[in-house]
Each structure stands twice: as structure tokens, then as C-alpha cells.
Amino acid sequence: MIIPNLPFNLPFNLPFNLPFNLPSILPSILVPLVGLLLPAITMVLSHLYIQNDEIL
């Protein structure tokens, strides 16, 4: 299967002019955000689960 190379600088018609190209900067924002928030949320939920656990 051939996957075409799609450039990230696709011409989008945005209603306002951005000083940078939005699709090319999205991975640099989303990857650290997911990399930091996902472990933090997991640690908080596991901490709350352990705190609410009762020994019967």
C-alpha cells in the first residue's frame, strides 16, 4: 500500500492571519501536552483509587 506524503503546510482559509502555519505547529503543542497530561491524570486517578480502597 502506498501512503502519499502529505505536507503539513496545506493552504487553509483561516478567517484571521496567523504569524505561523497552524498545522505545522500542532504536533509540537499536542505531543508534549499529551506526554505531560496523560501520565499526570493517570497518577492522580491511581492515587485516588488507592486512597479510596478499603481493606475488608
Curated annotation (Swiss-Prot):
- Protein's cellular compartments: Plastid, Chloroplast thylakoid membrane
- State the SUPFAM superfamilies in the record: Subunit VIII of photosystem I reaction centre, PsaI
Phosphoprotein is among the record's keywords: no
What biological process terms from GO does the record include? photosynthesis
Q: Which residues cross the membrane?
A: 28-50
- Listed GO cellular component terms? chloroplast thylakoid membrane; photosystem I
From the record, give the cysteines joined by S-S bonds: none
**Which InterPro entries did the record assign?**
PSI_PsaI (IPR001302), PSI_PsaI_sf (IPR036357)
UniProt topology in membrane: Single-pass membrane protein
Ordered alphabetically, the record's keywords are: Chloroplast, Membrane, Photosynthesis, Photosystem I, Plastid, Thylakoid, Transmembrane, Transmembrane helix
Family per record: Belongs to the PsaI family.
Q: What does this protein do?
A: May help in the organization of the PsaL subunit.
Protein name per UniProt: Photosystem I reaction center subunit VIII
| Species in which this protein is naturally found | Pinus koraiensis
Record gene name: psaI
